[in-house]
Amino acid sequence: MSKKRVVAIASGYFNPVHKGHIELFERAKEVADVLIVIVNNDKQRELKGSKEFQSEAERCKIIQSLKAVDGVLLSVDEDRTVRESLKLLYERYKKIEMMGGEHSVEHKLLFVNGGDQFSNTVAERDVCMEYGIYMIDGMGGKIQSSSWLLSETK
């Protein structure tokens, strides 16, 4: 007999993490059994033109410590998207066989967006459509911004 589990995937730079990110994670976890967070790597941060506030290792450690988060994946992508990371997670979660396949677990994947990202404009839309990853907007409003916080420290 097959079981279904919902896996929400959120992504971002989290440089630094703030209360808007926390709300995104908490709201995503309300609709999912598992929450995986893709943390954009330092190369992506440089491509974005953002100054380092925290290294990728620090950001991953902080995100992993949050109660709502079940797992963290440091982005494998070389551009500013998380397309390849989404493909990797799709392969990991599309179907996990346990006990000889009799008790398989199927996963419904959700790519969740916060207050300033929308499924009709995100660069990952094509991958989500191709792989059957559902996109959900509005998982937390634009409460705060890492850019705002960093500009206030100047």
What are these language model-derived features?
Residues 1-154:
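Nucleotidyltransferase catalytic core that binds NTPs
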